[in-house]
């Protein structure tokens, strides 16, 4: 099992890092009481599961439990349990600025100034920083740059992709998918719903595919969409985007949109730069309601 303790200064980006590690396939537990860390590891050794990577967030919100860290880590070493420590840090003035921008108080400051809380926190976390395997200073990092730094350290799973693309067909009559990044409307194409013998079929059937793709507009559309998506993919990856939902809609989500979604899926398949899947959201909806 890959076991990572994620810690660091409040305001340095620990919560953001935990979310990114979750995207990398880690099972994440934030703000775990120190007293439960040893028990969590015992449980992970007792039960066989599909969880192979765990990230545990620990910070000064643990209160007095943070003082037990040296003893707890020593117990892990005695059990020969492998773990790594990631420590996120930032310059004091940057931390103060971030707190002021969010109008939050430092967890150790109480009624004192933020600077006082930062000093106390550094004292409490010094042992973890001294024993950290990786230290990332986020003072000058953008969110996407932090993601890149984490990927350099932790991405070892060949199944993980920087970008995962979902191609989604849908019917406008049932609403545009709320998680869409790109929405394409293919209602400009002739509708097989009104062709005898085709109404009951779907875009997964060859008869519908042949009907839709016989029109030059359909082929020109998919050519241009394919070119646009292939242009966007490397730019999205460089900006740190990890999910892309391309929604293709017609009236009912059964014929035209399914056909074009399948065509795009075929064209984007076979590339190792991203993950890819296809969904037909409304293909099973009541055909009698129109297409």
From Swiss-Prot:
Functional description taken from the UniProt entry: Displays ATPase and GTPase activities.
Q: Which residues bind GTP?
A: 59-62
Specify whether Cell membrane is a keyword of the entry: no
The text of the family note is: Belongs to the RapZ-like family.
The answer to whether UniProt assigns keyword Transmembrane helix to this entry is no
* InterPro entries from the UniProt entry: P-loop_NTPase, RapZ-like, RapZ-like_N, RapZ_C
Q: Which organism is it from?
A: Agathobacter rectalis (strain ATCC 33656 / DSM 3377 / JCM 17463 / KCTC 5835 / VPI 0990) (Eubacterium rectale)
Which portions of this protein are annotated as coiled-coil regions?
none
Its ancestry begins with:
Bacteria, Bacillati, Bacillota, Clostridia, Lachnospirales
Please provide the record's keywords in A-Z order. ATP-binding, GTP-binding, Nucleotide-binding
* GO MF annotations, alphabetized: ATP binding; GTP binding
- Recorded superkingdom: Bacteria
Quote the protein name from its UniProt record: Nucleotide-binding protein EUBREC_0697
In this chain, ATP is annotated as bound at 8-15
């Amino acid at each position: 099992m890959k076991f990572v303790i994620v810690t660091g200064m409040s305001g340095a980006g620990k919560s953001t890092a935990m979310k990114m590690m979750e995207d990398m396939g880690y099972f994440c537990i934030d703000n775990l009481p120190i007293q439960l860390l040893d028990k969590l590891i015992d449980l992970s050794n007792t039960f066989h599961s599909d969880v192979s990577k765990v990230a545990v967030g620990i910070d000064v919100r643990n209160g007095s439990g943070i003082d037990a860290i040296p003893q707890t880590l020593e117990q892990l070493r005695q059990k020969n349990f492998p773990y790594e420590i990631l420590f996120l840090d930032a310059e004091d003035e940057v931390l103060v600025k971030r707190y002021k921008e969010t109008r939050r108080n430092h967890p150790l400051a109480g009624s004192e100034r933020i600077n006082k809380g930062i000093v106390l926190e550094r004292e409490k976390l010094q042992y973890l920083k001294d024993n950290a395997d990786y230290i990332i200073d986020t003072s000058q990092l953008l969110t996407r740059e932090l993601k890149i730094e984490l990927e350099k350290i932790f991405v070892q799973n060949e199944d993980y992709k920087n970008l995962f693309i979902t191609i989604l067909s849908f019917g406008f009559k049932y609403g545009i998918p709320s998680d869409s990044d790109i929405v394409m409307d293919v209602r400009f194409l002739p509708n097989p719903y009104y062709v005898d013998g085709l109404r009951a079929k779907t875009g997964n059937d060859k008869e519908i595919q042949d009907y839709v793709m016989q029109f030059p507009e359909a082929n020109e559309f998919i050519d241009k969409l394919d070119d646009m998506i292939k242009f966007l993919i490397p730019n999205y990856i460089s900006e740190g985007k990890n999910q892309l939902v391309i929604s293709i809609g017609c009236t009912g989500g059964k014929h035209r949109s399914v056909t074009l979604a399948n065509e795009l899926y075929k064209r984007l398949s076979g590339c190792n730069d991203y993950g890819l899947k296809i969904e037909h959201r409304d293909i099973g909806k009541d055909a009698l309601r129109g297409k």
